Amino acid sequence: MGAWASRGRAARVPAPEPESEPEEALDLSQLPPELLLVVLSHVPPRTLLGRCRQVCRGWRALVDGQALWLLILARDHSATGRALLHLARSCQSPARNARPCPLGRFCARRPIGRNPCGQGLRKWMVQHGGDGWVVEENRTTVPGAPSQTCFVTSFSWCRKKQVLDLEEEGLWPELLDSGRIEICVSDWWGARHDSGCMYRLLVQLLDANQTVLDKFSAVPDPIPQWNNNACLHVTHVFSNIKMGVRFVSFEHWGQDTQFWAGHYGARVTNSSVIVRVHLS
């Protein structure tokens, strides 16, 4: 018998596709400033301040200018957006050289405090009790914190304070005295699971001579020992701000209740002061 002959179809080799030319990246910096302004107005405020402002001098000038933020607010139909736009139009900031428009801070709800989570002890006036202040990792996640680190106290009262100059932060007297802003203060504090702790907070609104015009204090009950790494939040809103407020003094204390050498006291972090429009 003869061998079976197989008839296979010849495999088709696909023809090579023509090489496509690489697409050119879109360079937004080539846009006219008026058109680039419209494009940037669709970017979230925090991204504008944190990233876009760093791209180049041209972008920085647009982000620091008032026109971009007025364009953003004109499209914001929320109660906060409408109130902020009305405030911006009726209480315009004076011309400033090389100063970012403060509307960006309002839109992004950016705090005006410095070093809230323990990047060393910089920007704080400190008094060291016991073995003094140190910085450690958080034992419990603090929502919204820029970093998960905290300031830790010792077996005697440790004190830490910042005095914030509102005009240096870009706010001007007419705005501060308009009766249409409020100041929200916030602080997180907690304990180790194996040691109780105590905590105090004092926030004062000061005039140009640093005379106290208003204040808020919190002296919560101590956290007991064996507490599952408790973490608590303290907030207060100054909504009826008196004429003449120019500074905010933010001060807190902490210590442990076991009086152990080392750092077993109150753990404080994510301290913030936010100036925002008052919704009447």
Curated annotation (Swiss-Prot):
SMART domains: FBA, FBOX. Keywords: Ubl conjugation pathway. One of its GO terms (cellular component) is cytoplasm. Residues 1-26 are annotated as: Disordered. Disulfide bonds: none annotated. Residues 100-277 form the FBA domain. One of its GO terms (biological process) is ERAD pathway. Signal peptide: none annotated. Residues 25-72 form the F-box domain. One of its GO terms (molecular function) is ubiquitin protein ligase activity. Part of a SCF (SKP1-cullin-F-box) protein ligase complex. Interacts with SKP1 and CUL1. Substrate-recognition component of the SCF (SKP1-CUL1-F-box protein)-type E3 ubiquitin ligase complex. Able to recognize and bind complex-type oligosaccharides. This is F-box only protein 27. It comes from Macaca fascicularis (Crab-eating macaque).
